[in-house]
């Protein structure tokens, strides 16, 4: 049980996908201008990353390895992610049309989010079992969502702040992301992985 807790804390804080592994930067910068949109994207990405990581592990373990088709891993995982994203898009459209409109083009773009493919490939490379794969996918998504929501809250405050003209827009956003990354580096000694 301790191993699973360490995996969760380590993935969310110490090895954060956005701030440490630099995966998922496109939605991190693109959807983080409003807190509501960032929260919605975080929830959708959490659902997709968790489900895609489980499905990828199952396909790898039950189909690709037994049939010696390991060279098709990346292609198979991309197809799995596309199916999961389409399912998520249908669910969001039915349950929350407002959120569906807010997310706009970014919802289908979860398919091309490198963090989703990264979590599936890292699960296999790290040799995780089924439970570890599910937890790793969920933890990576929670870390992604946490950072995106924090970043969106900071960007909303910066939008009304008196920022010098050369630093407005993406410049201050990148500086803020760098400072957040430095803050998360403080968790490095927390968990030994």
UniProtKB/Swiss-Prot annotation:
GO terms for biological process: electron transport chain. Belongs to the NqrDE/RnfAE family. Its EC number is 7.-.-.-. It is a multi-pass membrane protein. Keywords: Cell inner membrane, Cell membrane, Electron transport, Membrane, Translocase, Transmembrane, Transmembrane helix, Transport. It comes from Shigella sonnei (strain Ss046). One of its GO terms (cellular component) is plasma membrane. The complex is composed of six subunits: RsxA, RsxB, RsxC, RsxD, RsxE and RsxG. The keyword Mitochondrion does not apply. Pfam families: Rnf-Nqr. The chain crosses the membrane at residues 5-25, 39-59, 63-83, 102-122, 134-154, 171-191. The keyword Calcium does not apply. It is an enzyme of class 7 (translocase). It comes from the Bacteria. It is found in: Cell inner membrane. Part of a membrane-bound complex that couples electron transfer with translocation of ions across the membrane. Required to maintain the reduced state of SoxR. This is Ion-translocating oxidoreductase complex subunit A.
């Amino acid at each position: 049980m301790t191993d699973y807790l360490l995996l969760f804390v380590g993935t969310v804080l110490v090895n954060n996908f956005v701030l440490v592994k630099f995966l998922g930067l496109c939605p991190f910068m693109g959807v983080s201008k409003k807190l509501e949109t960032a929260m919605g994207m975080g929830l959708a990405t959490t659902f997709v990353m968790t489900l895609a990581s489980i499905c990828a592990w199952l396909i790898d373990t039950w189909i690709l390895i037994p049939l010696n088709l390991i060279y098709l891993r990346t292609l198979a995982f991309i197809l799995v992610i596309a199916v999961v994203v389409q399912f998520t898009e249908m669910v969001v459209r039915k349950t929350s049309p407002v959120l569906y409109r807010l997310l706009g083009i970014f919802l289908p773009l979860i398919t091309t989010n490198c963090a989703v493919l990264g979590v599936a490939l890292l699960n296999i490379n790290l040799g995780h079992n089924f439970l570890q794969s599910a937890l790793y996918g969920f933890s990576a998504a929670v870390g992604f969502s946490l950072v995106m929501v924090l970043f969106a809250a900071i960007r909303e405050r910066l939008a009304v702040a008196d920022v010098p003209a050369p630093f407005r827009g993406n410049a201050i956003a990148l500086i803020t992301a760098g400072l957040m990354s430095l803050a998360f580096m403080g968790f490095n000694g927390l968990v030994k992985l």
